[in-house]
Amino acid sequence: NIYNNYKNLFSNFEFISKEKRNENLIFIFTGQFLGELHAPTKLLLERAYHLKKNFNKEILIINTSELLTKKAEIPFFESTFANKVDSYSNINQISYRDIEIPFYQSNTDMPDENEILNILSIVQEYKPYFILNIGSGNLTADLCSNLVTTVSFPTTSDIAISESQIHIHRSELTNKDFNLLKKTNIDPTSIVIS
């Protein structure tokens, strides 16, 4: 599968032990960042705000811009692609409420090997305590789970299919959920009901 191909490509990165990570630094990943009127972006900003204001954590938001990318476009009838605010690639912080949050947005069409390598290198250098991945289907966040603990926080009621070590789910697991977990090899003990 695509994930394993990329995982093999970046196999020289090693998992960073909890003791070597910066417990005051949290990275928040997303595949799409549009602004406060976009519900998933608002959810991300609220999480970033509370982690910074209530827990005094340093935050870096990374928009990998991977949601419904045009890279390797397949010519389907009426294909859809995600919106992207290109100007966000030129800024290094986002203002939200009464705080400034460091911000990085990929400016290339993803997935891009060099850009993924760049983001993996940022994670390796700064050693965040964990990565909170808002949404799902984020290849780069999944690859980063090989470096530090990654938490998936879906923006829908479905379980996020990811390589994260921790999966947040909004309701008790159903038989359908357990079947999906089995099919995707996600350990049910990795699910946190929130």
Cite the ranges covered by each PLM segment.
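N-terminal subdomain of nucleotide-sugar transferases
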Residues: 1-87
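Structural motif
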Residues: 29-33, 63-66, 107-110, 132-137, ...
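Structural alpha-beta junctions
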Residues: 50-61, 86-89, 96-99, 146, ...
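Short, charged/polar "capping" segments at the starts of alpha-helices
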Residues: 67-77, 140, 174-180
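Conserved nucleotide-sugar phosphate-binding/catalytic loop shared by glycosyltransferases and other
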Residues: 74-112
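Alpha/beta-hydrolase active-site loop
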Residues: 109-124
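Short N-terminal targeting/anchoring amphipathic segment
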Residues: 121-137
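Active-site-proximal region of nucleotide-activated glycan assembly enzymes
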Residues: 147-194
